[in-house]
């Protein structure tokens, strides 16, 4: 089981070449093994915000896109529950202030699973295992 960051989700679904071979392999091996690829529900919010700001264009409306992603075998969205919300404000060490990143990292820590991300700020954070 692993969790993917928002940009990784977009790159993976769209087949974007920005997705590293290591990240693609980790996602594919996870799905092929019958395990789950986890996506924080904050990613749906983040994608919607990027669309509203004109920074992301999808091939369909965001509701349909998220619905299609959720239909992929082995992909599961996890809601931001109270524990994740609270833990995102109490991350150990020095971590940047991006709320979505904090929620995703808190989810990875709660589930004790690696996070697939290209975000250097997260990769350099010593309190979560990353893949990229």
Show the residue positions of the predicted features.
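Short aromatic/basic micro-patch
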Residues: 3, 38-41, 79, 116
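Active-site neighborhoods of divalent-metal-dependent phosphate/nucleic-acid chemistry enzymes
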Residues: 57-59, 72-118
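Phosphate/NTP-binding elements of NTP-utilizing enzymes
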Residues: 47
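Active-site regions of enzymes building and remodeling cell-envelope glycoconjugates
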Residues: 127-132
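Short, well-structured N-terminal submotif of metal-dependent ribonuclease cores
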Residues: 1-39, 53-68, 111, 121, ...
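A general structural signal for well-ordered alpha-helical segments in protein cores
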Residues: 20, 44, 63-66, 81, ...
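Alpha-helix capping/helix-boundary segments
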Residues: 8, 43-44, 84, 104, ...
């Amino acid at each position: 089981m692993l969790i993917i960051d928002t940009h990784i989700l977009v790159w993976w679904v769209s087949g974007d070449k920005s997705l590293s071979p290591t990240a693609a392999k980790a996602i594919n091996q996870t799905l092929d093994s019958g395990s789950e690829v986890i996506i924080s529900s904050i990613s749906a919010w983040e994608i919607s915000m990027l669309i509203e700001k004109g920074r992301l264009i999808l091939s369909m409306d965001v509701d349909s896109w998220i619905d299609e992603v959720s239909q992929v075998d082995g992909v599961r969205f996890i809601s931001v529950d109270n524990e994740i919300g609270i833990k995102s404000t109490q991350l150990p060490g020095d971590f940047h202030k991006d709320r979505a990143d904090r929620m995703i990292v808190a989810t990875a820590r709660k589930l004790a699973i690696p996070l697939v991300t290209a975000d250097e700020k997260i990769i350099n954070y010593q309190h979560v295992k990353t893949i990229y």
